[in-house]
């Protein structure tokens, strides 16, 4: 509710993944508590898994109710309380999750739900002596600000706070010339445009060999022509409104840069309408320059930028992909050539924390694909695994 999600995206998030996090985090906690050191004859060694000394500040984004479930449940299962600041653009859905917790019997004061101004709340919370940690999902800029505030207040705290964060990405799809064009096109469309591209894992840039481009392009354009854009109440609408006017304006500013540049061409979409809601057409940009701004910067909207490379420059373009963006969250390689898959995996080892073969870079499942990346994408603490609870 209030997130601009159609029924299909809502079911994936606010039903299935919420339940998965609750169930799996309980299971992961039990594994952690059972892990004990060996004891020699006549002695007993024991690990006491004590909570951090204080409370955890959890800051959750607008795009996934499930993330709020994970950030709070992982903390309280390990014995800490939370001060929970939900995104101001998704208060309603998070409020209902809080009410469900209370109806289920969660004691008062375990999760403390505090919607409001992020800067005002953080200014109080991050100066508190009992702050023991921060569990964050959101923008890179906000995370950097919080980290700096924590650093500036180190003399205040009882202990060094543990900081865990996931901060977005500039996620890629990379195709080798042995790739299957229809599979590749499907990954581009679904990976870039589901939930209007408002996923940390959403595909935002693609590298396609020249020999594969025309047939892939025809599939992509056909699929986009069949996409309907509109209100979430009409289940025929695959693409719905972006979260707010600020997001709309930011997305359209990137599209405008492509419209006015001789280094890029828009081959699909490119229009937006905020007369009633904030709707942006699924947009595909072909960049002549691999360092064009929409290839490098996170947009967080339904915009995919494609760079077409010469087939004989596969390894050179892999290196280009690795070095183009400061992020390192998700990515995928499409190839039927095992050597190419292995080569891509080695070159792009640090370019993605979640790396997929012949699949779109979105849709990590709790317990199956632990989620998180490094570089500017965060601390790589792998949500959906026991590592996120430690």
Task: Please place each PLM-identified region on the residue numbering.
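Short beta-alpha connecting loops at secondary-structure transitions
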Residues: 82-84, 170-174, 201, 205, ...
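Rossmann-like NAD(P) dinucleotide-binding subdomain of oxidoreductase/dehydrogenase enzymes
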Residues: 31-183, 380
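Buried hydrophobic positions in well-ordered alpha/beta secondary-structure cores of metabolic enzymes
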Residues: 22, 56-59, 79, 111, ...
């Amino acid at each position: 509710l209030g997130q601009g999600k159609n029924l299909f995206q809502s079911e994936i998030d606010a039903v299935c993944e919420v339940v998965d996090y609750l169930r799996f985090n309980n299971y992961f906690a039990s594994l952690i508590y059972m892990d004990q050191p060996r004891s020699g004859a006549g002695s007993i060694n024991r690990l006491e898994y004590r909570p951090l000394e204080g409370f955890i500040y959890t800051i959750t984004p607008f795009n996934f109710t499930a993330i709020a479930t994970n950030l709070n449940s992982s903390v309280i299962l390990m014995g800490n309380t939370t001060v929970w600041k939900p995104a101001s653009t998704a208060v309603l859905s998070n409020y209902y999750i809080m009410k469900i917790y209370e109806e289920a019997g969660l004691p008062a004061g375990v999760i403390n739900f505090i919607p409001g101004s992020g800067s005002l709340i953080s200014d109080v919370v991050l100066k508190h002596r009992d702050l023991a940690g921060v569990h964050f999902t959101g923008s890179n800029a906000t995370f950097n600000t919080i980290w700096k505030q924590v650093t500036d207040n180190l003399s205040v705290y009882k202990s060094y706070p543990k900081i865990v964060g996931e901060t977005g990405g500039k996620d890629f799809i990379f195709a080798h010339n042995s790739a299957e064009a229809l599979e590749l096109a499907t990954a581009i469309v679904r990976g870039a445009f589901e939930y209007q591209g408002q996923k940390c894992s959403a595909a935002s840039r693609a590298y396609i060999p020249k020999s594969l481009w025309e047939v892939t392009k025809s599939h992509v354009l056909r699929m986009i022509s069949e996409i309907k854009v509109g209100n979430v109440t009409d289940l025929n609408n695959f693409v719905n409104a972006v979260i707010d006017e600020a997001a709309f304006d930011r997305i359209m500013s990137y599209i405008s840069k492509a419209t006015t540049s001789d280094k890029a061409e828009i081959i699909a979409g490119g229009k937006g309408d905020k007369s009633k809601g904030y709707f942006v057409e699924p947009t595909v940009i072909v960049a002549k320059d691999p360092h064009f701004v929409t290839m490098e910067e996170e947009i967080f909207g339904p915009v995919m930028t494609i760079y077409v490379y010469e087939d004989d420059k596969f390894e050179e373009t892999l290196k280009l992909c690795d070095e183009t963006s400061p992020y390192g969250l998700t990515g995928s390689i499409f190839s039927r050539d095992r050597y190419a898959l292995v080569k891509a995996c080695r070159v792009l080892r640090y370019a993605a924390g979640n790396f997929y073969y012949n699949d779109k870079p979105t849709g990590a499942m709790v317990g199956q694909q632990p989620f998180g990346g490094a570089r500017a994408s965060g601390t790589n603490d792998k949500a959906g695994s026991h590592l996120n609870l430690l």
